[in-house]
Amino acid sequence: MSGPEVHHLFHAPIADHSFSSDRQTLAIAKENNVELYQKSGSRFTLKDELKGHDKTVTGVDIAPNSGMIVTCSQDRNAYVWEPSPTGWKPTLVLLRINRAATFVRWSPSERKFAVGSGARLIAVCYFEEENDWWVSKHLKKPIRSTVTTLAWHPNSVLLAAGSTDSHARVFSGFVKGVDERPEASAWGERLPFNTVCGEYLNDSAGWVHAVSFSPGGDALAFAGHDSSITVVYPGGPDAPPRAMLSIPTQTLPFTSLIWNGEAEIIAAGYDCEAFRFRGGEAGWEMVGGVEAKTRPSLGAGAREESALHMFKQMDLRGKAKDDTRLNTTHQNTINTVRVFEGSADGVKKFSTSGVDGRLVIWTL
């Protein structure tokens, strides 16, 4: 595995990030705005800024085919941004929520997107041609607390959600007139809107930080605040799961995860690094970290500054070393893990971003 490609964009937290399908455009959620970067050689250069929200932007996602960008924020709003000759044109989405929007993702079909919120509901949004605006339907029951994370099934109908009521759930987000009726699967056959196809608790009933369907859609993984990853294999409509496997770890909690094929999961979070899990219905285990633990070398200027700092510390405190640098590439919590390059068979590259203002592209 080659070394990671590190882009230290700024000294502020990155709440979320998303790449365009050609991987030349990068959208970064920074404070109240979304910054758009363009690939220029080996660097990303700031090209544009999407301004419309007046509170912290919590989610951003670029639709792979249309290139439209959806954003959501603590100001309880979501915008769909479309490219135009004069720049990016925003359209306000009618979310109808009275608490912060927490998370947003396009469905694979790109006909709709889902927004999680602190209002104990999920807004499933779609475009209404007659009125020329984006409207929403609400998934409410049986959610009892803030929705922290969402993930679409490959069929664009089923939607997984994690929340602070400690449950990971699978809902039907079928919208008549927008979706085609999906084929029967292990999650169910007839799937009217708001059908609960699965509801799961991990061993310690901790907050759920991340959810993700396997590439084939027949398994669900979720990360809890007890530092565990749980993998569920559904048993069919109205039947208990064939298997529900919890993998305890000694790390800090994970905040985001992706599948690498059907037999590997990559998760990252408060430990500032990504970890790999491998297994199947018979069992799962953590096999180790993605990165080699070598401290990045300092450049000449940094070495000079470090030497000056050392002598200053010796003079002021009587000690030579006060090194707070972590031996990981990220120097703070990783908020988002995304597939950068790959297919259903496996991931070739993935990207991470976090509180340290770094975006890192990893090669597997």
Where are these regions (language model features)?
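Per-blade loop-tip surfaces of WD-repeat and WD-like beta-propellers in eukaryotic adaptors/scaffolds
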Residues: M1-P4, V34-K47, N77-N98, S109-K112, ...
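Eukaryote-specific detector of the first structured module of a protein
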Residues: M1-Y79, T86, R111
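Canonical WD40 repeat/beta-propeller blade segments in eukaryotic WD-repeat proteins
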Residues: H11-F19, K55-I62, N98-W106, R144-W152, ...
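Structural hallmark of WD40 beta-propellers
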Residues: R23-A27, S66-V70, V80, E110-A114, ...
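Conserved strand-to-loop turn within each blade of WD40 beta-propeller repeats
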Residues: A29-E31, C72-D75, G116-A119, G162-D165, ...
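Feature marking well-ordered beta-strand scaffolds used for ligand recognition
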Residues: R76, V211, S228, N327-H330
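Beta-propeller domains
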Residues: N155-G177, V208, P215
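Terminal intrinsically disordered, low-complexity extensions flanking WD-repeat/beta-propeller proteins
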Residues: V178-E199, R242-L364
